[in-house]
């Protein structure tokens, strides 16, 4: 199992905590952590097993809480997923993609990007992944290091003689670049 760390907090894998809303409103926690990998399994519908039971009344089948017989379940908490996937429907629809992105290590970057670019959670996981793919410029210790790397990458320093490169003010260049880029936790993306 891969552990991802964001700002010093270790997150094992993408997951939601699905719980009974009635129990929650009455001060009791009755729920279960469901990981993206569990949600991709064929018996994903059974992940509420132990939390809920199926009950049929007048040809209507509903999931009922085993503790209070409430019939509403909701996501109470989530970890290592963008806000747009923090509801049960989106989580289950994107579970396979979330698990794959987590295994490649890209999911943590998408969570960071979503926090900066989309705090309201309006962008889909596909839109975030596309934005990341088209605009990511890597991880750097400081804005100055990013500016140096960017200048070398785009060839801004190619025409400057080697002995004159020490006179380039990369701190100022970094301030100018950050009008066109955004950064969070040492990662840089071009604004689109």
Label for each model-derived stretch:
Residues 2-55:
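N-terminal ordered "arm"
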Residues 26, 56-60, 103-106, 125, ...:
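Residue-level signal for secondary-structure boundary elements
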Residues 14-19, 31-35, 67, 72-76, ...:
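Ordered hydrophobic segments in well-structured contexts
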Residues 41-121:
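Structured domain cores in non-transmembrane regions
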């Amino acid at each position: 199992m891969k552990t991802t760390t964001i700002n010093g907090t270790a997150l094992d894998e993408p997951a939601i905590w699905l719980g009974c809303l009635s129990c929650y409103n009455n001060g009791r926690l009755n729920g279960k952590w469901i990981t993206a990998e569990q949600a991709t399994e064929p018996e994903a519908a059974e992940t509420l097993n132990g939390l809920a039971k199926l009950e049929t009344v007048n040809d209507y089948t509903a999931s009922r809480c085993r503790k209070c017989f409430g019939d509403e379940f909701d996501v109470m908490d989530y970890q290592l997923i963008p806000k747009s996937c923090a509801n049960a429907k989106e989580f289950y629809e994107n579970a396979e993609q979330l698990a794959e992105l987590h295994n490649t290590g890209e999911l943590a970057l998408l969570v960071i990007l979503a926090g900066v670019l989309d705090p309201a959670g309006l962008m889909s996981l596909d839109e975030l992944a596309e934005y990341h793919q088209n605009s990511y410029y890597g991880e750097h210790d400081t804005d100055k290091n990013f500016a140096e790397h960017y200048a070398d990458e785009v060839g801004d320093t190619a025409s400057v003689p080697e002995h004159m490169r020490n006179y380039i003010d990369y701190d100022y260049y970094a301030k100018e670049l950050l009008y066109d880029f955004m950064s969070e936790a040492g990662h840089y993306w071009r604004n689109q």
